[in-house]
From Swiss-Prot:
Protein name listed in UniProt: tRNA uridine 5-carboxymethylaminomethyl modification enzyme MnmG
Claim: Cytoplasm is one of the keywords in the record: yes
Classification lineage: Bacteria, Bacillati, Cyanobacteriota, Cyanophyceae, Synechococcales
Keywords, ordered alphabetically: Cytoplasm, FAD, Flavoprotein, NAD, tRNA processing
One MF term in the entry's GO annotations: flavin adenine dinucleotide binding
Residues that bind FAD: 17-22
NCBIfam families: mnmG_gidA
PROSITE patterns: GIDA_1 (PS01280), GIDA_2 (PS01281)
Pfam families assigned to the protein according to its UniProt record, in alphabetical order: GIDA (PF01134), GIDA_C_1st (PF21680), SAM_GIDA_C (PF13932)
Family: Belongs to the MnmG family.
Cofactor field: FAD
Amino acid sequence: MEPAALPTESFELIVVGGGHAGCEAALTAARLGISTALFSLNLDRIAWQPCNPAVGGPAKSQLVHEVDALGGVIGRLADATALQKRVLNASRGPAVWALRAQTDKRQYARQMLQLLQHTPNLALREAMVTGLETSGSAESGDLRITGVRTYFGSIYNAQAVVLTTGTFLGGRIWVGNQSMPAGRAGEQPAEGLTEALQALGFATDRLKTGTPARVDRRSVALETLEEQPSDAHERWFSFDPEAWVSSEPMSCHITRTTAATHQLIKDNLHLTPIYGGFIDSKGPRYCPSIEDKIVRFADKDSHQIFLEPEGRDTPELYIQGFSTGLPERLQLKLLRTLPGLEQCVMLRPAYNVEYDYLPATQLLPSLQTKRVAGLFSAGQLNGTTGYEEAAAQGLVAGLNAVRLIRGQTPVHFPREGSYIGTLIDDLVTKDLREPYRVLTSRSEYRLVLRGDNADRRLTPLARELGLIDARRWQIYERKQEGIAAETKRLETVRLKVSDPVAPAVVEQTGAAIKGSITLADLLRRPGFHSNDLVRHGLADGELPVDVREGAEIDVKYSGYLARQTQQIERVQRQGQRLIPSGIDFYSITTLSREARERLTAAQPLNLGQASRLPGVSPADVTALLLWLELQDRQAATTTLARP
């Protein structure tokens, strides 16, 4: 009998994969004092941004703020490496404000690698993990991870393992009808790990995503295109001023598809992997290829395309909104149908990548797998898309792996408390069969779950868990004290109709002042903001912007916030609310069509079960709760009316 192989090394935690999920998981564990090893196929591609070199955007920026509030690093690095920043949806309410940063992808990766290399308790290893070492058995209910095995036969012991393999499991890239094994362009896929998971009883499936071509900016007539500069007032992802690094911004540019673009695509749809039938994996709904846009939105004669720089020391431009599966020989011709790109040089072709993933219904809310104790999964492996979603999952998986190792209870993030909670709740309860991205519409609590208050919601928890240090805690306390003081001032200081600035305020707001008015009530008037108070000499312009805006939001939306907080508490209480049998869900017109179908088929016993059905959104659950309460009131009224 051959003796068991001796382990090459032993760690408390092993993280497999060096993308955005893996980096957050490894850093979280190491900072909590756990002996951690991060394994990557290529240490020169740590935290690489293979698709859009950008961080943030709608709902994604809220995730980044939340990760930062919990001590994560994606926001700090985005602030340090930003080429430009813009606040999206700035004309709308604070619930949907979204900071987006175009980042220098090479600088981002370099800074992450340096951070990993200088973090105590963290080791980096370049190797392909192909197997999972376990003890016990599924039959006896004590199946547990004990380590990993690499391609060349080395065994590394660990008490817990976090898998963050991205698009590398069974990865295959496609350009037209040509394909090759790869996790992304120029990098080999991971072999063996999918089979190792399947051997342990896990179900796996395939997804796909894509990335557009890159062109040489020196070959593009940028001067003929609409310029999109950075916002004049710089905003930050991180709540830590030490992470704020200002640098000369770079502009993006905008072009549009033409009739020639659309015709070329229509004539060659059969040559793309999806429409040609070469692959049938589902791609991301909210990041469609240009051929998908033209097929799905046939009534539109043009689509907006953004030209975005990839870094300060590279001429490459990322062609956002123009991913394609067309053959390489047609891609340059397609690019040259765009205004400003008539003479462009294509440096890298667009491609699709198909990969294995682990449906996340096989996970607990801690992101530990249900089948194997000590085995966690995070990031694109769980069926998500986006660096931000990956970073959030990585932090949660790393944190809970530490707590498992130490015999502590896992930390669960409820969906009503954060977008992180919304993300994880959707992943582990809904049968998702396409790449998942976070959206503000996925949360019924978006007015409460804003980016600006992520620290208020999560930093006390981070302090309790040891994720942030005393300096960060002091920064948090100073900010909250400042907001409380300014809110109190706004609620008590009054502007009198006889005050010198009153006429200017009345002219701006278009509403008279009857005697006097508090500054808080002024802010509640449409179109009047804290900047206006400063302009009229009614607020201190030296007060930090985050303090002024935090106080403004608290007073301006106090009624809405109170109602949403009550709604959160009501839904929490009603999780076990029984649903009477025999309900005709089709008669409840406030439910979506899909929710009516799912509820009718499943006949859930309570609201908690209803909320976990695929296709039943949080808004549907709220609508069902309100309908049940209405039935209760009507029944009570009927009872009272009886003689």
